[in-house]
């Protein structure tokens, strides 16, 4: 996945916003909370996303994936896709959607309601 494809996908998720911060990283948010980050790799795009505890344990040892620099060292369950083989584009999209879901569930009930999220 290219950085442009990553951005198009993240933008397609409801109510997302994009900012550039942390030394030029592209940061995607839902309700003001980060769910995905692009950048930080010179040779290839690097994509960072939040995971469940189980997914974190499974993914951290896979080739092309690692605990996300800065975030995982603080005890947060974030994975960075930084090299091939990593995840397929379809696999990365699934994890990005799951990151979006996890982060949206952490928003206040008021914010979720304002955004029309998690109303099931």
Place the predicted regions along the sequence by residue.
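Charge-dense, helix-prone N-terminal extensions
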Residues: 1-120
């Amino acid at each position: 996945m290219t950085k442009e494809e990553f951005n198009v996908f993240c933008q397609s998720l409801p109510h997302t916003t994009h900012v550039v911060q942390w030394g030029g990283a592209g940061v995607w948010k839902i309700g003001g909370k980060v769910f995905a980050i692009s950048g930080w790799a010179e040779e290839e795009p690097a994509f960072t996303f939040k995971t469940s505890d189980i997914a974190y344990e499974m993914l951290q040892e896979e080739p092309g994936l690692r605990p996300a620099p800065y975030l995982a060292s603080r005890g947060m369950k974030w994975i960075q896709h930084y090299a091939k083989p990593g995840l397929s584009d379809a696999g990365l999209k699934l994890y990005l959607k799951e990151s979006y879901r996890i982060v949206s569930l952490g928003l206040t009930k008021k914010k979720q309601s304002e955004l029309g999220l998690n109303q099931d």
